[in-house]
Amino acid sequence: MGIQIELGEIKADVVFKDIKNIHLSVYPPSGMVKISAPLRMDIDKIRIFAISKLTWIKQQQKKLQEQERETPREYLDRESHYVWGRRYLLKIKEADKAPSVELKHKTMILSVRPGADDKKKQEVLDAWYREQLKKATYPLIEKWEPLMGVKVERLFVRRMKTKWGSCNHRAGNIMLNTELAKKPHECLEYIVVHEMAHLLEHKHNAHFISLLDKFMPKWQFYRDKLNQLPVSHENWNY
């Protein structure tokens, strides 16, 4: 069950869940505000809580508004695309064979069948990014499992509109945003550690922060670096 409350010019979506504490989040790219509240919490208490966070909400929304956006993809020759933080110029090749993506020097060669439209080109490139992300993530999981004393049961990779990653701590699964394959490797490693830390502490509380401080002392540097990079043009914070 959910409702929407107004805080002056700001609207917040409230979702009632079987939880003990209230949580408030601001999501990119538009600064959408979402509040997760205990099932029986009074709406006036929720409003008071949200009002107490107004200054922080506005600060986060301002950061998101100032964050650079990638231009919409048109899949044209010499269009810029990124892989692990490096810029490549796109080259479209039409050939009557299985679609593929290849990196050569500073060029990304996207091979598609003759007549392929933009949707098909995007599908081929998205599938390639997913595969690159999986290949890079599995070694990181293997590295951090013994260091953190946790076990990741399954890894999922898909396009996510509001998060870099998520964790199902009960099932032991983590999910990563395909967009991470466009960012520097150290940013991916930070998100992997962040999500694996949720296997030890599922809330964003002081204990969770202490875990990040312990396992990755420079985590705030990597978080800030990631959130300062251009985000995808579509509607999609750590």
Question: For the regions a protein language model found, what residue spans apply to each?
Answer:
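Active-site-proximal or metal-binding-adjacent scaffold patches in catalytic folds
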Residues: 1-190, 199-238
